[in-house]
Structures are given as C-alpha cells and as structure tokens.
Amino acid sequence: MSDWTAFLKQELQQAYMQQTLDYVAKRRSEGVAVYPPKDQVFSAFTATQLSDIRVVILGQDPYHGEGQAHGLCFSVLPEVKKLPPSLKNIYKELASDINDFVIPTHGYLQSWAEQGVFLLNTVLTVEQGQAHSHKHLGWEQFTDKVITHINTHCEGVIFILWGAHAQKKGKGIDSARQHILAGPHPSPLSAHRGFFGCRHFSATNALLQSQGKTPINWQV
C-alpha cells in the first residue's frame, strides 16, 4: 500500500476536490479528450512513495497532445517519438552538466520517479490542445496541500523550481528543512535566460551526497 493512501483518501473527500473531480468526469463524459487518462491522473503518487522522496520537480499542467501525458511532469510515454521542447532542453542541460549523460531518444522519466524524484504538476488534468484549460478548478489547492505534506513529513528534500510559476508555488517551502534550487523554465522561451548552465542536476547530487544519500542516476 502506498504511504500516500491516507493523505489522498482524506484530501480527495474534501468538497473542493469533489467539485474538481466531478468537473473532470463531466468533461470526459461529454466526449472531451482530457489528459492524462483517468487511471494515470495520480501516477506521481504511485511512482514515488512519500517516504522515498529525495527530490521534487514542479511542473505546470500536463502535456495537451494526444498520448503524451501520463501523470509525471515533463515525462512522456515511451512510444512518443517527438519529444516536447522543454524536455529536449532538460536533456541538453543534463548533457552539459552530467559526465557521460547520453541524450535519450525517448522522454519516459519513470526511472527518476523510482529513485525518489517526485514529478509533480501543479494542475493534474488538461483538455486536448488547450493549455491551462483546467487552471483554477481546485488542483492548485490540492497540490499546495501535497507540498505542505512533503514539507512536514520529509527533510532534506531538494525542490527544483523552474520558472516564476513553480517559484511562486514553492513560497511556503521551509528552506531551513529543505533545499531549494530555482531558475528559469526550460521552455524555448526562457531556457537561454539561465536555464542552460544552471547545473541543477549536479547540484542536486552534491546536496544528496552531503546528506549521505545516494545521488540520482539521471540517465534514462
């Protein structure tokens, strides 16, 4: 059983989340393509146990192209051939930051999640072709609670906050208990403003090693 179970059970029963889930279900029943598929909306919580979290990467909302999103931020399913631009830029930075990192031909980041990298989007659903279409439905409140829960129950976690959206979201993180790495978003619009060269991946591993923890193998 996941150690997220009690938290999820309690939070998903709250009135605001019932409204969110009802709206998403209604849109699906009307024939609207909502991503990720229903059984993958909470994939981040099954991929990474609370007690295993060592790193948190915050995204915005899921990819809105067909067959891409599967519940882990920035990640796409293995069969996706055309990688999203932000993920390509993440790989470029990894190649310059981490010795021997080979840029993959796929964008499936499940192995990061299995090593304790919690890949959380701020908003957990989106409609096809409509970025931010499920903004302000209640997901933001839910993911605020998730971050607070991690902040309370874990220590020494490295929060990677790319872009103003993630940095605003991370304002409540206790920097005395956790580590924060902040910088521009990897999207093509901002990657050249300081995302390239941020070296957040090697910095994360240095922070983990300073705590006596195993570094992340970023190769996927």
Curated annotation (Swiss-Prot):
Annotated Pfam families: UDG
Family annotation (CDD domains): UDG-F1-like (cd10027)
Any GO BP: base-excision repair, AP site formation via deaminated base removal
Catalytic activity, as annotated: Hydrolyzes single-stranded DNA or mismatched double-stranded DNA and polynucleotides, releasing free uracil
One Gene Ontology CC term in the entry: cytoplasm
E.C. code: 3.2.2.27
Annotated keywords: Cytoplasm, DNA damage, DNA repair, Hydrolase
UniProt-annotated location(s): Cytoplasm
Catalytic-site annotation from UniProt: 61 (proton acceptor)
Gene Ontology terms, MF aspect: uracil DNA N-glycosylase activity
UniProt similarity note: Belongs to the uracil-DNA glycosylase (UDG) superfamily. UNG family.
Job description of the protein: Excises uracil residues from the DNA which can arise as a result of misincorporation of dUMP residues by DNA polymerase or due to deamination of cytosine.
NCBIfam families: PRK05254.1-1 (NF003588), PRK05254.1-2 (NF003589), PRK05254.1-4 (NF003591), PRK05254.1-5 (NF003592), ung (TIGR00628)
HAMAP family, per database record: UDG
Protein name: Uracil-DNA glycosylase
Gene that encodes it: ung
